[in-house]
From Swiss-Prot:
Binding site for Zn(2+) 2: C558, C560, C575, C577
Effect of gene knockout: No visible phenotype under normal growth conditions.
Pfam family, one: JmjC
Residues annotated for Zn(2+) 1 binding in this entry: C544, C547, C567, H570
Tissue: Expressed in inflorescences, roots, siliques, leaves and stems.
One biological process term in Gene Ontology: regulation of DNA-templated transcription
Native organism taxonomy: Eukaryota, Viridiplantae, Streptophyta, Embryophyta, Tracheophyta
Taxonomy, superkingdom: Eukaryota
Principal location: nucleus
Protein name: Probable inactive lysine-specific demethylase JMJ19
PANTHER family xrefs: INACTIVE LYSINE-SPECIFIC DEMETHYLASE JMJ19-RELATED, LYSINE-SPECIFIC DEMETHYLASE
Skewed-composition ranges (Basic and acidic residues): 678-694
Location of the JmjN domain: 108-149
Gene behind this protein: JMJ19
Subcellular location: Nucleus
């Protein structure tokens, strides 16, 4: 076509219809480079005119010609080699907020129980909840009579037990450095967002004796060398280690966190397993220490009657943990795993200063942490990577987040409430022991923790559903015994307050059953149903292969992978097999779960007996005694039994069991109180009938009354 053809085509007015020839459409954009114009003779033809047919002065026609080519990117030039290099994100250090030296945090409440109040651990803590939970933390000073022996001072532990502490390095050289945690990586730890980063490394081995010697020497040298390092102009009056008080050490801690001038390193022994290292409390109850076997002995706190952890056998939450600190060693911001309660006792040593943000301000705290890490590093914090950081509680207070301060001395307890974030630092060598527990009011917090873990695909340390239905088993048992004997026991009092039509525990069970019902109706209605075998989770708890959620109540399995399960929400992500090859596994039917609600509401004694029989026969918990005859014991099967058992068979059991039950109940039941409900249960359970026990007619019961 040539230059003349292009010019003719342009003059004809067909500029908008120009398109690339077939096969010449560019798949990528390219950039036109501006070429400098040299001085040329009038006769010479520019390179631009040779290639496009336009002169340098005909700019409008040239622009129209180029705009008809959609593969050309306009308004760009070829960048220089330096511009092509990837730019590093500019990281600016956050300018420390000017916190007034006179800024005072709100103090946590301190309680002094009497001998009588101190006797029942969980009841006393429950009485403090309304007053102390808004602070997130509180301190309990035991009565003068409570002086348990510190077994950590015994020679076999003090000089023989070895541990490997963390080396915490913070200061100028560690700013803006992200270091992953080498200890328990807890997504709930707020150590991932803060103002001052800290490096954590594994330290050498120490005994308590050698660690104390190192801690005392370090404390003397640190405050003795402070004036020499900072200079006489910037230094404060010289402080001797034996004259230091908590306020002096806290001032030094604030200096390190908010505006460090030197780099320092300290040691901190965190989360030492007392089952291996040794506990400060006596494990047994000899004659001289029998009075220290109460719930305030942290070896028995998790398993106290009324703590749901007594129904769980998980060492990671049931075994107390030991912490060994030194001057300026820090516990970084964190929240307890599964949002459990914590009870901390300071055995020996210097005081510890705690800072806490209550669970009601949890969202504000997390938002402030994210903004701090974004401003410091220029990138969003990742859920899986948690760098170790510290944040000044006084700066949090300036941001509008209420922070509580608590000073714990040796021989005192500190209670951390569910959902609270907390941090701490030590004023010198000390040994602190911590135990978790879960009273009934923890269940709403545990439910939230389960949902958060599933969203983050994180394994839960405990099975929430197992705890929930194990607690239901205990509640029905206590209510049933009271219905028979009319004896007001401590167990009945505890469960009677939370059960009933509008009780806390009853409402939690109803909510969980409603959620399970909706999932079964809308997600797995087309799958074949099978009841779980007792060997399903006899060894290990089952988890969803996608979200790692607990599968105690229901699960989905496929024939292509026998040991692979998923929750109902992630059924389609289990495998690529069609639905006809997948099976829905359940522990209880919906009718049986509705029967549990009736039993907890306490309206009918017959519902309690029927649920107890169902729960004993099909509960896969190893702690539950099997109701099978003796000849069936010892038989094991790896297959999941199909759902071919009807409700009448479940309620009936064997004839021998029915006769034994009838003889035992006949001696206990009162003729006037509750006799009708009990007889209805026994009579209906001895029949092969599909009718519920509470629908039996009065005519069928009349002749049996005459016989009795």
């Amino acid at each position: 076509m040539g230059i003349e053809g292009v010019s003719t085509y342009l003059k004809s007015g067909n500029m908008d219809t120009i398109s690339a020839p077939p096969g010449f459409v560019s798949q990528t954009s390219f950039v036109l480079r501006n070429v400098p114009r040299d001085k040329e003779s009038p006769r010479s033809v520019s390179r631009q005119e040779q290639t496009t047919g336009f002169g340098t002065d005909d700019k409008d026609s040239c622009n129209m010609f180029l705009k008809s080519r959609p593969w050309i990117v306009h308004g760009h030039t070829i960048p220089s080699s330096e511009a092509l290099r990837p730019k590093k994100t500019e990281v600016r250090r956050r300018r420390p907020l000017k916190v007034s030296e006179t800024k005072v945090l709100e103090e946590a409440p301190v309680f002094n129980p009497t001998e009588e109040e101190f006797r029942d651990t969980l009841s006393y803590i429950s009485s403090l909840r309304d007053r102390a939970e808004p602070y997130g933390i509180c301190c309990v000073v035991p009565p003068p009579s409570w002086k348990p022996p510190c077994l950590l001072k015994e020679k076999q532990i003090w000089e023989a037990s070895t541990f490997f502490p963390q080396v915490q390095l913070f200061g100028i050289q560690t700013e803006n450095r992200k270091i992953k945690k080498e200890v328990d990586a807890d997504s709930n730890d707020a150590a991932s967002e803060g103002v001052q980063l800290c490096r954590v490394e594994r330290g050498p081995g120490y005994t308590l004796k050698s660690f104390k010697n190192f801690a005392d020497t370090y404390k003397k040298s640190h405050f003795g060398m402070k004036d020499e390092v900072l200079g006489s102009e910037n230094s404060s009056p010289s402080l001797k280690p034996n004259e230091l008080i908590v306020a002096d050490i806290e001032k030094e801690y604030r200096q390190i966190v908010e505006s460090p001038l030197i780099e320092i390193g300290v040691l901190y022994g965190n989360d030492l397993d007392t089952a291996t290292f040794g506990s400060g409390f006596p494990l047994s109850a000899p004659s001289e220490s029998s009075k220290y076997s109460s719930g305030w002995n942290l070896n028995s706190t998790a398993k106290l009657p009324g703590s749901l952890l007594s129904l769980e056998d998980c060492e990671s939450v049931c075994v107390p943990r030991l912490s060994v600190g030194m001057c300026l060693s820090s516990q970084f911001w964190k929240s307890e795993k599964e949002r459990l309660y914590s009870l901390c006792y300071l055995h020996v040593g210097a005081p510890r200063v705690w800072y806490s943000v209550a669970g009601c301000h949890r969202s504000k705290f997390k938002a402030a942490m994210k903004s701090f890490i974004l401003e410091m590093s220029g990138e969003q914090p990742k859920k899986s990577h948690n760098p170790v950081m510290m944040m000044s509680p006084y700066q949090l207070s300036v941001e509008g987040i209420p922070v509580t301060r608590c000073v714990q001395h040796p021989g005192q307890y500190v209670i951390i409430f569910p959902g609270s974030y907390y941090s701490a630092f030590d004023c010198g060598f000390n040994c602190l022991e911590k135990a978790n527990f879960a009273p009934l009011d923890w269940l709403p917090h545990g439910d939230i923790a389960v949902q958060v873990n599933q969203e983050m695909s994180k394994t839960s340390l405990i099975s929430y559903d197992k705890l929930l239905f194990s607690a239901a088993r205990e509640a029905v048992k206590c209510l049933k015994e009271y219905g028979l004997s009319k004896k007001n026991t401590a167990c009945y009092t505890r469960w009677n307050d939370s059960c009933g039509t509008d009780g806390l525990f009853s409402n939690i069970i109803k909510s969980r059953i409603k959620l399970e019902k909706n999932r079964r109706e809308f997600l797995i209605s087309s799958l074949e149903s099978q009841r779980m075998d007792k060997s399903y989770d006899a060894v290990n708890k089952r988890e969803c292969c996608v979200c790692l959620g607990d599968l105690y109540l229901s699960a989905v399995n496929c024939s292509c992978s026998a040991n692979r399960y998923s929750c109902l929400n992630h059924m389609r992500k289990l495998c690529a097999c069609p639905c006809d090859r997948k099976s829905f596994l359940y522990r209880y039917t919906m009718d049986e779960l509705n029967l549990l609600v009736e039993a907890l509401e306490g309206k009918k004694l017959s519902s309690m007996f029927r649920w107890a029989g169902i729960d004993q026969k099909f509960c896969a918990s190893p702690a539950t005694t099997s109701s099978k005859p003796e000849e069936d014991k010892g038989k094991e099967t790896d297959e999941v039994t199909p759902c071919n058992i009807t409700r009448k068979d479940v309620a009936a059991g064997t004839k021998d069991q029915t006769r034994v039950k009838a003889r035992s109940l006949a001696d206990i039941l009162n003729v006037k109180d509750g006799n009708n409900d009990a007889k209805e249960t026994l009579e209906s359970c001895s029949k092969k009938s599909n009718r519920p026990c509470d629908n039996d007619s009065s005519e069928a019961n009349a002749p049996k009354k005459q016989k009795q």
